[in-house]
Amino acid sequence: MSRQRINGHESVGCDQSVSSGQSTNGTEDMNENKAHRRTVACVLNALRPQTVLDICCGDGWLSRALAQPTVVDGIDFYASAPEGYAQFQTADFNLGIPETFGQYDAAICCEAMGYLQNPGLFLQSVRAHLKPNATFVLSLPNPNYAGARINHLIQGFPRSYSWFTQNHSAEPHMPWLTLGLFQLWLLLGLNGFTDINVHEVDEKKPRRQSERIIGCFIKAYARKKIKSASSAAVAQLWRQALSDQVVYGRQLVISARLSALAEA
């Protein structure tokens, strides 16, 4: 049984299954390729919100993963209305959260930040639809894990993605924006969020021995930055950068709390 801190509180049991992991049609909601979903569900189940906004809700897996009755509303650009959602709207979240949605105890955005054209404006919109002290949870690919840094020598940084075949219209799989821990820490902080935490994802870390070697250099640099940090907040950021999840993990799951002092 694992313990982790979520917005300053210790939660228990985040390595346990929060549901059967099976959708109503028999397919797996949270298989090994979607381990980030288990982590996101764990964070929410520890917080026990009464209302949640699921941004880019896809197949509606979240409503089946929550351990207690929760009102879940959803937004998606491509998917149709999933079962179990109280309110759903097809919308382009590049334009922000539609005004028809209210304010929530929590919001999530899984595997969608890399598609955004205006991430700062998006976070401002999310903030407007969260109650004070509400939690925002997001997941996205980790662009800077040890193995990726080798690939950067070939494809550059940000990477020259091979699936870019046209630039005339949006497609379901056309991520372009490379956001890592440090960029998210900055963006979330600038938009009124605090208590920014990286959460463990159940994945093999590292996957290759070469990554472990590179990781030694990454961790040595992070330890040096912790010692020279100009503030406690910056030192905490580098401590999270030192974690195996950030150094070796393919996924990032990050939570942040909306400060009660943040302007709507």
Question: Which role does the model predict for each range below?
Answer:
Residues M1-G102, A106, G120-L123, E200-K225, ...:
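Conserved N-terminal segment of class I S-adenosyl-L-methionine
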Residues T27-N31, G114, P172-P175:
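Short, surface-exposed alpha-helical recognition segments that flank or form part
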